[in-house]
Amino acid sequence: MAADGTLSRGGVGEAVEEEHPGALEPGAAPFGNFPHYSRFHPPEQRLRLLPPELLRQLFPPEGPEKRPILGLDVGCNSGDLSVALYKHFLSPRDGETCSGASRELRILCCDIDPVLVERAERDCPFPEALTFITLDIMDQESRKVPLSSFLSQFGRSVFDMVFCMSVTMWIHLNHGDRGLCEFLAHVSSLCSYLLVEPQPWKCYRAAARRLRKLGLHSFDHFRSLAIRGDMAKQIVRILTQDHGMELACCFGNTSWDRSLLLFRAKHTHETQAIPESSTKETRTD
Protein backbone atom coordinates (compact mmCIF):
# COMPACT_ATOMS: atom_id res chain seq x y z
CA MET A 1 0.00 0.00 0.00
CA ALA A 2 1.19 3.49 -0.58
CA ALA A 3 0.96 5.30 2.61
CA ASP A 4 1.53 8.83 1.46
CA GLY A 5 -1.96 9.66 0.41
CA THR A 6 -2.86 6.18 1.30
CA LEU A 7 -2.39 2.76 0.20
CA SER A 8 -0.47 0.55 -1.94
CA ARG A 9 -0.20 -2.97 -1.01
CA GLY A 10 3.48 -3.44 -0.97
CA GLY A 11 2.39 -3.03 2.60
CA VAL A 12 4.46 -6.03 2.81
CA GLY A 13 7.63 -4.18 3.05
CA GLU A 14 7.95 -4.13 6.80
CA ALA A 15 8.87 -7.76 7.05
CA VAL A 16 11.00 -7.58 3.93
CA GLU A 17 12.96 -4.71 5.38
CA GLU A 18 14.03 -6.86 8.31
CA GLU A 19 14.77 -9.99 6.33
CA HIS A 20 16.19 -8.47 3.11
CA PRO A 21 17.35 -4.92 3.95
CA GLY A 22 19.16 -4.43 0.66
CA ALA A 23 16.30 -5.55 -1.56
CA LEU A 24 14.00 -2.56 -1.28
CA GLU A 25 14.25 0.68 -3.16
CA PRO A 26 15.07 3.49 -0.70
CA GLY A 27 12.20 5.74 -1.73
CA ALA A 28 9.57 3.03 -1.48
CA ALA A 29 9.53 2.34 2.26
CA PRO A 30 7.47 5.34 3.42
CA PHE A 31 4.60 4.30 1.16
CA GLY A 32 4.73 0.53 1.30
CA ASN A 33 4.46 0.25 -2.49
CA PHE A 34 7.42 -2.04 -2.99
CA PRO A 35 7.85 -3.00 -6.64
CA HIS A 36 8.75 -6.68 -6.13
CA TYR A 37 6.88 -7.57 -2.97
CA SER A 38 5.69 -11.00 -4.09
CA ARG A 39 9.28 -12.18 -4.45
CA PHE A 40 9.64 -12.06 -0.67
CA HIS A 41 6.10 -12.84 0.44
CA PRO A 42 4.57 -14.98 -2.32
CA PRO A 43 0.76 -15.14 -2.57
CA GLU A 44 0.83 -18.86 -1.83
CA GLN A 45 1.59 -18.15 1.82
CA ARG A 46 -1.79 -16.46 2.20
CA LEU A 47 -3.68 -18.80 -0.10
CA ARG A 48 -2.73 -21.88 1.89
CA LEU A 49 -4.65 -20.41 4.84
CA LEU A 50 -7.79 -19.55 2.86
CA PRO A 51 -10.24 -22.34 1.95
CA PRO A 52 -10.76 -22.33 -1.85
CA GLU A 53 -14.50 -22.75 -1.37
CA LEU A 54 -14.79 -19.75 0.96
CA LEU A 55 -16.58 -17.39 -1.42
CA ARG A 56 -18.81 -20.10 -2.83
CA GLN A 57 -20.01 -20.98 0.65
CA LEU A 58 -20.40 -17.40 1.87
CA PHE A 59 -22.26 -16.35 -1.28
CA PRO A 60 -24.21 -19.29 -2.70
CA PRO A 61 -26.04 -18.73 -6.02
CA GLU A 62 -29.46 -17.13 -5.69
CA GLY A 63 -31.86 -18.45 -8.32
CA PRO A 64 -31.05 -19.48 -11.90
CA GLU A 65 -29.19 -16.23 -12.66
CA LYS A 66 -25.95 -16.18 -10.70
CA ARG A 67 -25.05 -12.60 -9.93
CA PRO A 68 -21.31 -12.07 -9.62
CA ILE A 69 -19.52 -11.86 -6.30
CA LEU A 70 -18.03 -8.38 -6.01
CA GLY A 71 -14.69 -7.78 -4.31
CA LEU A 72 -12.53 -4.75 -3.54
CA ASP A 73 -8.79 -5.26 -3.14
CA VAL A 74 -7.31 -2.28 -1.29
CA GLY A 75 -3.61 -1.69 -1.94
CA CYS A 76 -3.27 -4.15 -4.78
CA ASN A 77 0.36 -3.31 -5.63
CA SER A 78 1.21 -4.84 -9.03
CA GLY A 79 -1.69 -7.27 -8.87
CA ASP A 80 0.08 -10.54 -8.11
CA LEU A 81 -2.01 -11.30 -5.04
CA SER A 82 -5.21 -10.05 -6.71
CA VAL A 83 -4.73 -12.51 -9.56
CA ALA A 84 -3.78 -15.31 -7.17
CA LEU A 85 -6.88 -14.73 -5.03
CA TYR A 86 -9.09 -14.79 -8.11
CA LYS A 87 -7.61 -18.07 -9.34
CA HIS A 88 -7.68 -19.59 -5.86
CA PHE A 89 -11.34 -18.86 -5.16
CA LEU A 90 -12.60 -19.66 -8.65
CA SER A 91 -10.54 -22.64 -9.65
CA PRO A 92 -12.99 -24.80 -11.63
CA ARG A 93 -14.60 -27.67 -9.82
CA ASP A 94 -15.22 -31.06 -11.42
CA GLY A 95 -17.36 -30.64 -14.50
CA GLU A 96 -17.08 -26.83 -14.49
CA THR A 97 -15.44 -24.83 -17.26
CA CYS A 98 -13.00 -21.99 -16.72
CA SER A 99 -15.27 -19.61 -18.59
CA GLY A 100 -18.17 -20.54 -16.34
CA ALA A 101 -16.13 -19.92 -13.23
CA SER A 102 -14.79 -16.59 -14.46
CA ARG A 103 -18.24 -15.02 -14.50
CA GLU A 104 -18.72 -15.50 -10.78
CA LEU A 105 -16.26 -12.97 -9.37
CA ARG A 106 -15.40 -9.37 -10.21
CA ILE A 107 -12.72 -7.53 -8.24
CA LEU A 108 -11.95 -3.82 -8.24
CA CYS A 109 -8.26 -3.51 -7.36
CA CYS A 110 -6.87 -0.15 -6.27
CA ASP A 111 -3.47 1.25 -5.39
CA ILE A 112 -2.04 4.73 -4.93
CA ASP A 113 0.97 4.01 -7.15
CA PRO A 114 0.16 4.53 -10.86
CA VAL A 115 3.29 2.69 -11.98
CA LEU A 116 2.27 -0.46 -10.10
CA VAL A 117 -1.30 -0.16 -11.36
CA GLU A 118 -0.07 0.14 -14.95
CA ARG A 119 2.01 -3.00 -14.47
CA ALA A 120 -0.96 -4.83 -12.97
CA GLU A 121 -3.17 -3.90 -15.93
CA ARG A 122 -0.52 -4.92 -18.44
CA ASP A 123 0.17 -8.32 -16.88
CA CYS A 124 -3.36 -9.28 -15.77
CA PRO A 125 -4.50 -12.57 -17.34
CA PHE A 126 -8.15 -11.89 -16.43
CA PRO A 127 -8.94 -8.35 -17.64
CA GLU A 128 -12.64 -9.12 -17.86
CA ALA A 129 -12.76 -9.95 -14.15
CA LEU A 130 -10.12 -7.75 -12.50
CA THR A 131 -10.26 -3.97 -12.82
CA PHE A 132 -7.19 -2.00 -11.71
CA ILE A 133 -7.38 1.70 -10.85
CA THR A 134 -5.12 4.29 -9.27
CA LEU A 135 -6.86 5.49 -6.11
CA ASP A 136 -6.01 7.12 -2.80
CA ILE A 137 -8.44 5.33 -0.53
CA MET A 138 -7.95 7.96 2.17
CA ASP A 139 -9.13 10.79 -0.10
CA GLN A 140 -12.79 11.03 0.80
CA GLU A 141 -13.71 12.95 -2.33
CA SER A 142 -11.75 11.09 -4.99
CA ARG A 143 -12.79 7.63 -3.79
CA LYS A 144 -16.54 8.17 -4.08
CA VAL A 145 -16.99 8.09 -7.83
CA PRO A 146 -14.82 5.09 -8.78
CA LEU A 147 -16.24 2.90 -6.01
CA SER A 148 -19.87 3.80 -6.64
CA SER A 149 -19.42 3.59 -10.42
CA PHE A 150 -18.07 0.06 -10.18
CA LEU A 151 -20.88 -1.06 -7.89
CA SER A 152 -23.57 0.57 -10.03
CA GLN A 153 -22.52 -1.54 -13.02
CA PHE A 154 -23.97 -4.49 -11.15
CA GLY A 155 -26.88 -2.72 -9.48
CA ARG A 156 -25.23 -3.03 -6.07
CA SER A 157 -24.54 -0.63 -3.22
CA VAL A 158 -21.84 -2.60 -1.35
CA PHE A 159 -19.14 -5.13 -2.10
CA ASP A 160 -19.51 -8.71 -0.96
CA MET A 161 -15.90 -8.86 0.21
CA VAL A 162 -13.17 -6.30 0.82
CA PHE A 163 -9.54 -7.46 1.01
CA CYS A 164 -7.07 -5.42 3.12
CA MET A 165 -3.84 -7.35 2.90
CA SER A 166 -0.89 -5.76 4.72
CA VAL A 167 -2.12 -2.20 4.34
CA THR A 168 -3.25 -1.16 7.83
CA MET A 169 0.24 -0.25 9.08
CA TRP A 170 0.89 2.14 6.21
CA ILE A 171 -2.45 3.87 6.77
CA HIS A 172 -1.69 4.09 10.48
CA LEU A 173 1.87 5.42 10.13
CA ASN A 174 0.94 8.05 7.59
CA HIS A 175 -2.46 9.13 8.91
CA GLY A 176 -2.24 8.39 12.62
CA ASP A 177 -4.77 6.81 14.97
CA ARG A 178 -7.57 8.89 13.54
CA GLY A 179 -6.67 7.87 10.01
CA LEU A 180 -6.61 4.17 10.88
CA CYS A 181 -10.02 4.39 12.55
CA GLU A 182 -11.45 6.34 9.61
CA PHE A 183 -10.06 3.77 7.18
CA LEU A 184 -11.55 0.84 9.10
CA ALA A 185 -14.87 2.67 9.38
CA HIS A 186 -14.93 3.27 5.64
CA VAL A 187 -13.99 -0.20 4.42
CA SER A 188 -16.36 -1.85 6.90
CA SER A 189 -19.20 0.28 5.53
CA LEU A 190 -18.46 -0.93 2.01
CA CYS A 191 -18.97 -4.66 2.43
CA SER A 192 -20.67 -7.67 3.90
CA TYR A 193 -17.35 -9.39 4.70
CA LEU A 194 -13.93 -7.89 5.36
CA LEU A 195 -10.66 -9.84 5.20
CA VAL A 196 -7.79 -8.10 7.01
CA GLU A 197 -4.12 -9.03 7.32
CA PRO A 198 -2.76 -6.59 9.94
CA GLN A 199 0.94 -5.95 10.31
CA PRO A 200 2.20 -6.60 13.86
CA TRP A 201 3.78 -3.82 15.91
CA LYS A 202 7.31 -5.08 15.31
CA CYS A 203 6.83 -4.13 11.66
CA TYR A 204 6.04 -0.54 12.65
CA ARG A 205 9.33 -0.32 14.52
CA ALA A 206 11.20 -1.88 11.61
CA ALA A 207 9.68 0.57 9.12
CA ALA A 208 10.65 3.58 11.25
CA ARG A 209 14.13 2.17 11.86
CA ARG A 210 14.71 1.61 8.18
CA LEU A 211 13.89 5.22 7.36
CA ARG A 212 16.32 6.42 10.01
CA LYS A 213 19.08 4.24 8.56
CA LEU A 214 18.42 5.74 5.15
CA GLY A 215 18.62 9.24 6.58
CA LEU A 216 15.00 9.98 5.67
CA HIS A 217 12.34 11.60 7.82
CA SER A 218 10.52 9.27 10.16
CA PHE A 219 6.77 8.83 10.03
CA ASP A 220 5.18 11.91 11.58
CA HIS A 221 2.69 9.95 13.66
CA PHE A 222 4.84 7.04 14.84
CA ARG A 223 5.80 8.27 18.32
CA SER A 224 2.37 9.70 19.07
CA LEU A 225 0.34 6.62 18.20
CA ALA A 226 -1.90 5.55 21.07
CA ILE A 227 -3.16 2.49 19.21
CA ARG A 228 -0.21 0.10 19.49
CA GLY A 229 0.86 -3.26 20.85
CA ASP A 230 -1.10 -6.26 19.61
CA MET A 231 -2.38 -4.76 16.37
CA ALA A 232 -4.55 -7.74 15.42
CA LYS A 233 -6.44 -7.39 18.71
CA GLN A 234 -6.61 -3.62 18.31
CA ILE A 235 -8.18 -3.94 14.87
CA VAL A 236 -10.61 -6.58 16.13
CA ARG A 237 -11.61 -4.20 18.92
CA ILE A 238 -12.14 -1.23 16.60
CA LEU A 239 -14.16 -3.15 14.04
CA THR A 240 -16.33 -5.04 16.52
CA GLN A 241 -16.94 -2.30 19.09
CA ASP A 242 -17.19 0.73 16.83
CA HIS A 243 -18.24 -0.41 13.37
CA GLY A 244 -20.83 -3.14 13.61
CA MET A 245 -18.60 -6.03 12.56
CA GLU A 246 -18.07 -9.38 14.21
CA LEU A 247 -15.00 -11.59 13.96
CA ALA A 248 -16.20 -14.53 11.91
CA CYS A 249 -12.95 -16.47 11.63
CA CYS A 250 -9.20 -16.35 12.09
CA PHE A 251 -7.61 -18.46 9.38
CA GLY A 252 -4.24 -18.64 11.11
CA ASN A 253 -0.90 -16.95 10.60
CA THR A 254 1.41 -16.65 7.63
CA SER A 255 5.03 -17.73 7.87
CA TRP A 256 5.92 -14.05 8.45
CA ASP A 257 3.59 -13.97 11.47
CA ARG A 258 0.54 -12.11 10.20
CA SER A 259 -2.96 -13.30 10.93
CA LEU A 260 -5.77 -13.45 8.39
CA LEU A 261 -8.96 -12.18 10.05
CA LEU A 262 -12.39 -12.42 8.47
CA PHE A 263 -15.06 -10.02 9.73
CA ARG A 264 -18.78 -10.10 8.99
CA ALA A 265 -21.15 -7.17 9.12
CA LYS A 266 -23.69 -7.91 11.83
CA HIS A 267 -26.54 -7.19 9.44
CA THR A 268 -25.26 -9.88 7.06
CA HIS A 269 -27.30 -13.06 7.04
CA GLU A 270 -25.09 -16.06 7.73
CA THR A 271 -26.10 -18.56 5.07
CA GLN A 272 -23.29 -21.07 5.41
CA ALA A 273 -20.73 -22.13 7.97
CA ILE A 274 -17.30 -20.73 7.19
CA PRO A 275 -15.04 -23.55 5.96
CA GLU A 276 -11.99 -24.31 8.04
CA SER A 277 -8.50 -23.51 6.86
CA SER A 278 -6.46 -26.40 5.57
CA THR A 279 -3.77 -25.51 8.13
CA LYS A 280 -3.94 -25.81 11.89
CA GLU A 281 -2.54 -22.39 12.69
CA THR A 282 -5.10 -20.51 14.75
CA ARG A 283 -3.15 -17.86 16.63
CA THR A 284 -4.44 -14.29 16.54
CA ASP A 285 -1.44 -12.75 18.24
Swiss-Prot record:
S-adenosyl-L-methionine binds at residues 46, 77, 111, 136-137, 165. One of its GO terms (cellular component) is nucleoplasm. Its EC number is 2.1.1.-. It is an enzyme of class 2 (transferase). Pfam families: Bin3. Gene3D superfamilies: Vaccinia Virus protein VP39. It catalyses: a 5'-end 5'-phospho-ribonucleoside-RNA + S-adenosyl-L-methionine = a 5'-end (5'-methylphospho)-ribonucleoside-RNA + S-adenosyl-L-homocysteine; a 5'-end 5'-phospho-ribonucleoside-RNA + 2 S-adenosyl-L-methionine = a 5'-end (5'-bismethylphospho)-ribonucleoside-RNA + 2 S-adenosyl-L-homocysteine. Keywords: Cytoplasm, Methyltransferase, S-adenosyl-L-methionine, Transferase. It is found in: Cytoplasm. Residues 53-275 form the Bin3-type SAM domain. O-methyltransferase that specifically monomethylates 5'-monophosphate of cytoplasmic histidyl tRNA (tRNA(His)), acting as a capping enzyme by protecting tRNA(His) from cleavage by DICER1. Also able, with less efficiently, to methylate the 5' monophosphate of a subset of pre-miRNAs, acting as a negative regulator of miRNA processing. The 5' monophosphate of pre-miRNAs is recognized by DICER1 and is required for pre-miRNAs processing: methylation at this position reduces the processing of pre-miRNAs by DICER1. Interacts with DICER1; the interaction may be mediated by RNA. This is RNA 5'-monophosphate methyltransferase.
